[in-house]
Amino acid sequence: MPLLDSFKVDHTKMNAPAVRIAKTMLTPKGDNITVFDLRFCIPNKEILSPKGIHTLEHLFAGFMRDHLNGDSIEIIDISPMGCRTGFYMSLIGTPNEQEVSEAWLASMQDVLGVQDQAAIPELNIYQCGSYTEHSLEDAHEIAKNVIARGIGVNKNEDLSLDNSLLK
């Protein structure tokens, strides 16, 4: 099985909250695809609650599009990490970490503006595979934490995992 890029970085050196350009690629037609690691929690020390990350998934995807999409940027997908320490965001375009950070902070403010669980998009049995597993309160706590701590930048060259540790 090939070793994925996300496992070639040293998770013990990651800061959070922080933005990292996880991968860039060029499509055959010349479009730039950028994958961002949006790290909410320090790996192996903090974790997002299942209900909080699920609610955030429903809110964050739309709010980030509101703040980041434009003429040269279109978000393809924002998905939670299985380790529950953040999200991956794939998009067409090449925004820098500062642009992504600003959109992320604005999105967290938007999350705090949602005051009723009924206002969570797609929160119903037809559009969500676990529609009862949500917590607006947990999502608010996550957003407050990001805002209070601020968003830094994780650089791949600072996180390079020594080859002797690759398995």
From Swiss-Prot:
Gene Ontology BP annotations: quorum sensing
EC category: lyase
EC number: 4.4.1.21
One Pfam family from the record: LuxS
UniProt KW Lyase keyword: yes
Residue numbers binding Fe cation: 54, 58, 128
Keyword Metal-binding in annotation: yes
InterPro entries the UniProt entry points to: LuxS_sf, Metalloenz_LuxS/M16, S-ribosylhomocysteinase
Cofactor binding annotation: Binds 1 Fe cation per subunit.
GO molecular function annotations of the record: iron ion binding; S-ribosylhomocysteine lyase activity
Keywords: Autoinducer synthesis, Iron, Lyase, Metal-binding, Quorum sensing
Essential cofactor(s): Fe cation
Reactions catalysed, as given in the entry: S-(5-deoxy-D-ribos-5-yl)-L-homocysteine = (S)-4,5-dihydroxypentane-2,3-dione + L-homocysteine
Domain of life: Bacteria
General function of this protein: Involved in the synthesis of autoinducer 2 (AI-2) which is secreted by bacteria and is used to communicate both the cell density and the metabolic potential of the environment. The regulation of gene expression in response to changes in cell density is called quorum sensing. Catalyzes the transformation of S-ribosylhomocysteine (RHC) to homocysteine (HC) and 4,5-dihydroxy-2,3-pentadione (DPD).
Subunit structure: Homodimer.
Family: Belongs to the LuxS family.
Protein name in UniProt: S-ribosylhomocysteine lyase
UniProt lineage: Bacteria, Pseudomonadati, Pseudomonadota, Gammaproteobacteria, Pasteurellales
